[in-house]
Amino acid sequence: MSFSEQQCKQPCVPPPCLPKTQEQCQAKAEEVCLPTCQHPCQDKCLVQAQEVCLSQCQESSQEKCPQQGQEPYLPPCQDQCPPQCAEPCQELFQTKCVEVCPQKVQEKCSSPGKGK
């Protein structure tokens, strides 16, 4: 029980892709990880922290992200999202963009003048 308790007590470690936003990431990861990852500790904590950390600190760490982390860390929505949609999606719709980018984002980003 000691081993599990010590691991759980430790804060969620953000991905190695946020060197500049580590402080902000840790705060967000702790809030989401500690209460939700107290049971599965690190296994689930890391996944949850990465998802929250990336969506929140990605725009800032996007440039600092290494080539290896860019592919898995960057949302698969940027490729499908048009340039007009990627800008607003990165600021407010980052988390939602990854989930339903081609549907919700396009509708919100698509201007009434351009159909595509």
From Swiss-Prot:
UniProt cross-references to InterPro entries, sorted A to Z: PRR9
Domain of life: Eukaryota
Record PANTHER family: PROLINE-RICH PROTEIN 9 (PTHR48427:SF1)
Annotated protein name in UniProt: Proline-rich protein 9
Organism expressing this protein natively: Homo sapiens
